[in-house]
Design a protein with these regions (language model features):
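RNA substrate-binding interface of SAM-dependent RNA methyltransferases
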Residues: 81-165
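N-terminal positively charged helical leader segments and presequences
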Residues: 1-77
Length: 165
């Protein structure tokens, strides 16, 4: 999984070094930051801007790109044991999911479930969440109706909101 951009790269360097597999730099960086990368004993690649743009799929990489180990979703059974969870029904936009994850994490939500989606961009969602999804348990469920039944059976009280009013 590729992530890019100064803020998320610094967050991963600070909190989740164990996830870093490779480092890609497309410009000169501060010597202190470079020494932090060097201490990880991971392969550091100096790449031109064209290669960096390809790795970041055109995103604003700011010269900093990391290859991380694969993201693993939290099993639903683990989230069902939590007290305060948030369910996102049918949301697919990585910017929206990331922003909601940041807010949920800061408000003390224990876990988050995305329901009624087929696929999600893990790297984009983690990047837009500013790393919150690396610390917030996150699961995916294929059907929101079935998920609601499972959560009620597990003792949850469901509260819903819709943008339709």
């Amino acid at each position: 999984m590729i992530i890019y951009g100064k803020q998320i790269v610094l967050y991963v360097l600070e909190k989740h070094q164990d996830l870093i597999e490779e480092i890609f730099l497309s410009k000169e960086i501060d010597s202190k930051l470079f020494s932090r990368f060097a201490k990880l004993n991971k392969k550091i690649h100096k790449v031109d801007n064209q290669k960096a743009q390809a790795l970041a799929k055109g995103g604003n990489h700011q010269g900093l790109i990391l290859k991380l180990s694969d993201y693993h979703y939290t099993p639903l059974k683990d989230i069902k044991n939590m007290n305060f969870i948030l369910v996102l029904d049918g949301l697919t936009d990585v910017g929206n999911i990331g922003a909601i994850a940041r807010t949920a994490y800061s408000l003390g939500v224990d876990g988050m479930i995305a329901a009624d989606i087929k696929t999600i961009s893990n790297s984009g969602t983690i990047r837009t969440s500013a790393g919150a999804l690396l610390d917030l348990p996150f699961a995916i469920h294929p059907r929101s109706v079935d998920l609601a039944s499972e959560l009620i059976d597990a003792g949850f009280t469901l509260i819903g909101a819709t943008m339709d009013g």
